Amino acid sequence: MNVTSNATAAGSFPLAFGLKTSFGFMHYAKAPAINLRPKESLLPEMSDGVLALVAPVVAYWALSGIFHVIDTFHLAEKYRIHPSEEVAKRNKASRMHVFLEVILQHIIQTIVGLIFMHFEPIYMTGFEENAMWKLRADLPRIIPDAAIYYGYMYGMSALKIFAGFLFVDTWQYFLHRLMHMNKTLYKWFHSVHHELYVPYAYGALFNNPVEGFLLDTLGTGIAMTLTHLTHREQIILFTFATMKTVDDHCGYALPLDPFQWLFPNNAVYHDIHHQQFGIKTNFAQPFFTFWDNLFQTNFKGFEEYQKKQRRVTIDKYKEFLQERELEKKEKLKNFKAMNAAENEVKKEK
């Protein structure tokens, strides 16, 4: 019996893609031997730990680049949340300033990631068959071998990553909300991000460096530690969270965008938070909205509409913004007329 070859076969990555595998090791009379060895990297030139730091940065600029091309060549004007001229008119930070601040944020998060990685264990393999054999012995026979195999090899990772999603959402909601409730924190830190009233993709991580460290870098670092993510699981969590954050700030409500279909916390939802009328609402980010719903901090302007439909459409949101602008102009017109009338009365006296 070649235990080493069995361990290697059962733990090999391609099996997840439907290649034939045998679960016979789960029915050995004795538990398969443990043959610990360092887990090979996905890329021969780079460790998985380094890849977990590089992949989110590459994903950030790749996805931002796609949206920038769409923006520059006007490829999806129908789905643009705000007219293109508003980007220059309403935003207080230049694109170059935003670009440099995001580069700084990436440098900081990479350095912090390297520090975290220094204290992480060396991830090993060669114990998986032994662990699954024990599970097979303890679990009812009605549970198929394949369920144990794929549940152990991939299901547990999915649960850990989902737990990471929940922690990141919790961390960011309460810290983000605190930044708005405390005037000092808002003035010194969070106000930088709100210099972009009309968000765009590569401005997603445009923050004061201190806020960027606390909100994004430290939050995901703690999530990684508490959920005991391996380097490969970190790659998924960090990269997915990064792409979701970019998509939330992209400035478009694209109908086939998977992020905007999978999550209620989408580009329109977050755009409301960047507007003056919604700045004290919609704190939840980047995945779910349950904290906003629980604490009633979600924007109520779409409450009736959301009862009828699962998500806010781009047309409805544009209509809403136009109505607010007309109301604002009408109020200003009435205010000026009232002042003029008061001045006339004073002159007559």
UniProtKB/Swiss-Prot annotation:
What processes in GO biological process is this protein linked to?
A: sphingolipid biosynthetic process; sphingolipid metabolic process
Q: Does the keyword Endoplasmic reticulum apply?
A: yes
Q: Could you tell me one molecular function GO term of this UniProt entry?
A: sphingolipid delta-4 desaturase activity
UniProt enzyme class: oxidoreductase
Query: According to its record, how does it sit in the membrane?
Result: Multi-pass membrane protein
Q: Which InterPro entries match?
A: Fatty_acid_hydroxylase (IPR006694), Sterol_Desaturase_Related (IPR050307)
Question: Which reactions does this protein catalyse?
Answer: sphinganine + 2 Fe(II)-[cytochrome b5] + O2 + 2 H(+) = (4R)-hydroxysphinganine + 2 Fe(III)-[cytochrome b5] + H2O; an N-acylsphinganine + 2 Fe(II)-[cytochrome b5] + O2 + 2 H(+) = an N-acyl-(4R)-4-hydroxysphinganine + 2 Fe(III)-[cytochrome b5] + H2O; an N-acyleicosasphinganine + 2 Fe(II)-[cytochrome b5] + O2 + 2 H(+) = N-acyl-4-hydroxyeicosasphinganine + 2 Fe(III)-[cytochrome b5] + H2O
> What does the record give as EC number?
1.-.-.-
- Reading the lineage from the top rank, the first entry is Eukaryota
Which one Pfam family would you cite for this protein?
A: FA_hydroxylase
Which residues are the signal sequence here? none
Cellular location(s): Endoplasmic reticulum membrane
The transmembrane residues are 9-29, 50-70, 99-119, 148-168, 209-229
Annotated disulfide bonds: none
Key words, A-Z = Endoplasmic reticulum, Lipid biosynthesis, Lipid metabolism, Membrane, Oxidoreductase, Transmembrane, Transmembrane helix
Q: In which pathway does it act?
A: Membrane lipid metabolism; sphingolipid biosynthesis
Can you cite an annotated GO cellular component?
Answer: endoplasmic reticulum membrane
KO phenotype (gene knockout): Phytosphingosine (PHS) absent from cell, with an increase in dihydrosphingosine (DHS). Leads to abnormal cellular complex sphingolipid levels. Simultaneous knockout of SVF1 leads to a growth defect.
Domain Fatty acid hydroxylase, first and last residues per copy: 162-297
What PANTHER family is this protein classified in? STEROL DESATURASE
**Of which family is this protein a member?**
Belongs to the sterol desaturase family.
| Additional remark text | Present with 54300 molecules/cell in log phase SD medium.
Role summary: Catalyzes the conversion of sphinganine to phytosphingosine in sphingolipid biosynthesis. Involved in the response to syringomycin.
Protein name listed in UniProt? Sphingolipid C4-hydroxylase SUR2
